[in-house]
Regions:
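A conserved mid-protein helix/loop that constitutes part of the nucleotide-sugar donor-binding site
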Residues: 16-21, 199, 203-222, 328
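Short, structured helix-loop element that forms part of the nucleotide-activated donor/catalytic region
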Residues: 43-47, 231-258, 262, 343
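Donor nucleotide-sugar binding/catalytic pocket of nucleotide-sugar-dependent glycosyltransferases
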Residues: 54-55, 134-186
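Short His-centered aromatic/hydrophobic patch
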Residues: 88-94
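Aromatic "clamp/platform" in nucleotide-sugar-dependent glycosyltransferases that forms part
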Residues: 264, 283
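Short hydrophobic beta-strand element within catalytic cores of glycosyltransferases
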Residues: 291, 300-303, 313
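Conserved acidic donor-binding segment of nucleotide-sugar-dependent glycosyltransferases
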Residues: 315-316, 320-327, 336-342
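A short, well-ordered alpha-helix in the C-terminal region of glycosyltransferases
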Residues: 329, 336, 343-358, 364-370
Length: 376
């Protein structure tokens, strides 16, 4: 009989996008049950991955009453399912899932830490976030930071004294290099997006403050004033509730004719293929998939010196690393990429090979399998 594993995320889109294919792979060796908040994505995950799904409502934000309800629901579920392992991803699922698994004395309790919020928070919020992360670690038997930066922060801030395990070279699910490639179909679609005769900078993600969008808007305004033959392609949507951009930033982005909005896209490959440089001035990450994807598509990247980004990008090799929150450094890096075509093309030529050699999906999946087997 296969051992049972509960994989828990706060919202189903995390199962759908971050763990694509992984649940199906693990289900060949274990009985995998996917648990998350209700939603059409949860149903889609069940069909695509061939796993059973269970809906348990969880809130991403701090919500004491709902959090207690979610905890009790998870305890009931775990007592019913009697899993060998509970493996959580995302902060709230980690806190509630690890606590419920500890209450039920599940033998293996694994949590993966991705982007940490507390290092960039202040005051009471920071103390509360650190306390919840400490509780998550206290309940877990196996703690898996997504990368070296996350591992260092967990140690530096004294979140836990337990051993921390990075699987492979880091990342949640690795990258499918055969999918993120400049195929004929992708390049045909890219031709309809590309603007000839200019250098296109591309950003993919939520258009919010902590992705560095305020700095990017101001830097591009200055860049475009000096070098009209440039373009900014934004693939993502504004968010009005969680960390919206400044009103003047939104106005700047919407009114500039050299900025193109593509909105949210299920397939970002044509947009990356139609671009020359990927720019990602985020304040905090765990191990950003989008930087891996841009690199796999052969783009040099401008990233900030934060967790994950500074592991994926080697400065001057496959991109440039700049300080976060630094508009002038961002402008300087964008100017360099725009004016030095030789350096830009040289970095582009090394991007795909570097990403594939360290983060190819089949390699990471094999490391995940070995990790699970070592815990049996």
């Amino acid at each position: 009989m296969k051992k049972k594993v509960l994989r828990i995320t706060t919202v189903p889109v995390s199962l759908d996008l971050l763990l694509k294919g992984q649940l199906k792979m693990l289900n060949e060796m274990y009985e995998v049950v996917a648990v998350s908040s209700p939603g059409k994505e949860l149903e889609e995950v069940g069909k695509r991955e061939g796993v059973r799904t269970v809906a348990v409502r969880m809130e991403r934000r701090i919500s004491p009453i709902q959090d207690l309800k979610s905890l009790f629901a998870l305890v009931r579920l775990i007592r019913k399912e009697k899993p060998w392992m509970v493996h959580t991803l995302t902060p709230k699922a980690g806190l509630l899932g690890m606590l419920a698994a500890w209450i039920c004395r599940v033998p293996v309790r694994m949590h993966m830490f991705t982007g940490l919020v507390f290092p960039t928070s202040t005051g009471l919020k920071r103390k509360l976030l650190m306390a919840t992360d400490r509780l998550t670690c206290a309940c877990a038997t196996f703690i898996n930071p997504e990368g070296e930066g996350v591992k260092n922060d967990l140690m530096r801030f004294g979140i836990t004294r337990k051993e921390l395990h990075i699987v492979g070279n880091g990342n949640i699910n690795g990258i499918d290099m055969s999918y993120f490639d400049r195929t004929e179909e992708v390049m045909r679609k890219a031709e309809n997006i590309r603007e000839k005769g200019c250098v296109t900078f591309c950003f993919v993600g939520r258009i919010v403050g902590d992705k560095g969008m305020n700095e990017l808007a101001r830097a591009f305004k200055q860049l475009e004033a000096d070098f009209p033959a440039c373009r900014l392609l934004l693939v993502g949507d504004f968010e009005e509730k969680l960390d919206p951009v400044l009103p003047e930033t939104k106005r700047m982005l919407l009114e500039n004719s050299r900025i193109t909005f593509a909105g949210w896209q299920n397939d970002i490959r044509p947009y990356l293929a139609a671009s020359d440089v990927f720019v990602f001035p985020s304040y905090r990450e765990g191990f950003p998939n989008v930087v891996l994807q841009a690199g796999a598509m052969g783009l040099p990247c401008i990233v900030t010196d934060i967790n994950g980004c500074n592991e994926i990008i080697c400065h001057g090799v496959n991109g440039l690393i700049i300080p976060s929150h630094d508009e002038s450094a961002l402008l300087k890096a964008m100017k360099f990429m725009l004016t030095d075509e030789h350096a830009r093309m040289e970095m582009a030529g090394k991007s795909r090979e570097l990403i594939g050699s360290r983060y190819e999906r089949s390699f990471l999946w094999n490391e995940i399998r070995k990790t699970y087997q070592s815990l049996e």
